[in-house]
Amino acid sequence: LVAWGGGSAIENAAKYVGPGFQLISFDPKVSMSIVGREAFESEETLREVAELAALDATIFNQDACLAARHICVEGDDEQVDRFCALLHERLGVDRDFAEAFGPKPDAEIRDAVEGMRFLEPEYRVWGTFDGSGLVVRSPEMVDFHPTNKTVNVIPVAAMREAASYATVATQTVGVYP
């Protein structure tokens, strides 16, 4: 039996292991998105890209491994912050596969994000812990697993830099343009 996922998924799969079966488990898969500088060509384009990124991030309230947890954005701090603000607005929307208010972030995320609020301007946070969505801009990937509509945005000077954030655990990469 081969299973991918976090602790609860592996525990559930282990129930089916019996004589003649062996459990082979793999870490959860993580998806990301990459947004190119072209997103900033107009306000309309930026809003469209923020909507697309929100769609990528909120599938099944981010429970699906194909939901983006990290988004690398090519741009300067002002541009990336504008994207983050628009993304935050779009996370809290009812969708076919996501609710406006999903599960609230767990204590690990809350504690880490509260600490990051004191580290501006290097880190910046949009949103609260009410389940409507949270965006964290940081100079590198955060050291917690973003879930429950929590998105980590990482500014990059060039799109090729985003490749360094992909690992063996990366499942899907959304790309704009």
Positions of the model-derived regions?
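NAD(P)-dependent aldehyde/semialdehyde dehydrogenase
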Residues: F60-G174
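Conserved NAD(P)+-binding/catalytic subdomain of aldehyde/semialdehyde dehydrogenases
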Residues: L1-H70, G75
